[in-house]
Amino acid sequence: MNFEANYRDLQSKMSFKDGKNGGKKGLKNQININAVFLPFVSRNPERAKFKNGFKGVLGEFARLVLDKTWDDELSADEIVKKIISEERVDCSLENEKYLEKLIADYLFDDNNDLNILKPSLFLYLPRNENNEKKGEYEIALFIRDVFFNKKDDFEFDEKFKDFFKDFNSNHILIKLILKSIFELPEKEIPLKYDTISNGVVNLFKEDINFLLDKNETYLLNNMELIFAYYYFFYSSQCTLLIDKDFKGDFDGGIEPLYYALDWESISKNRKTIKQGFNLVYDANAYLFDKCCLLSQLNTYMGVEGKLLFELNDEFNEYGDEDKQECLKWLKKWIDDYQYVKDISTLSRNSRIDIPENVDNEFGDVVNLLSSTLYEGVDQAVRSRYSLNIREIAKLYFLKNRGVHGSILNLTQDMFLVITSLCIKEDKIKLNHLFGEYEKRGLFFDKYSKEKIVDLLNNLNLIDK
């Protein structure tokens, strides 16, 4: 392998300038280059705050799945006018205003949000009007790429496309609206994000496939909660896996995160306090640094979408000569970085644990690069990046419990939706049900389990 050429490519990708010949020295801490794992952004205005829930993401997602794009000129009034103006709608001028109001009242709620009467109307959920639309768009693209990658499961993707193409209805007004609805502009967007947690993806497909086959109405009515949960589930597991560095692997299963229930009280000894969102929070503290590290190493080693433990396997496949060349030019890159960032001393706080299966020299050089990034990344950028996962958690999965702080929490609505995905059509044995919860990332201590049993017994959902 030509590591010198890879080194030059890395310089280019990171906008490296050595400052010679009177120029200004510098480089950019770029992420999402050859290692694109999460849809997080580092600029506060662009970070999704979910003021309208997950609807903005679902609208973008539906359009991405069907290779459509939003028309920025559209508004609630424009949508109604476009429906009325279609040739299929034939009415006199005196009745036009009445029809406009009738359609508007049916299509939009009191907050002027679109009522999703049929799956095809997801396409017309508007973008956020401010810069947060970039953050929502990236999340939608991430969900499409990770969960609906047509290269991996063409049949599943086509089935979901058919779901969004449903323009049929027996209701006369809905039928009028759907027949008169206008086409959005076409735009195909290439894949961007890498998938690193196939176990979560496979569970998602299992659950969505069941609903597409057996209960599309339930999917339509609960799509916001289902997609928001799986986005948080995947993102948190992905973050925890990246944080394991060399110690990660794909065989370790789901990392346990304990939840409390919205309707129960909490004491200091509960598992969710010590093994809940605090783990995700800690892993996110230096996530930007780790994404920089992975982008640089993937680019330098001429690969894509690999985590640190996979890059170690890659290095171990090299012959002795390639290993030495790899280390030589990687050290050169670290020298470059330290030079343009004026880094003279390194903190030991950023050191990565090196297991026995990691080549000592490779581990030491990666550690040196990690420590260098620790000094070279702006703390404000690092902090803003760590807030991305907290935004979705605040909306659906966190509750302030006084002295215990914010802990992972499930509302009854969210809990019952995930329960329905676990149970499917038939009643289920209690032990099997808790196993299904844990497969989906929901872990409960004995106190929460007692509350769950009480609720499910009242709803007659489990076999005793």
Regions found by a protein language model. Give the residues of each.
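Charged, amphipathic alpha-helical stretches
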Residues: 1-113
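A short, conserved structural fragment
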Residues: 457-464
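Long, low-complexity, charged/polar intrinsically disordered regions in eukaryotic proteins
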Residues: 324-407
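Long, internal scaffold/assembly segments composed of regular secondary structure
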Residues: 213-347
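Short amphipathic alpha-helical interaction segments
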Residues: 442-455
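Long, mid-chain structured domain cores
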Residues: 81-257
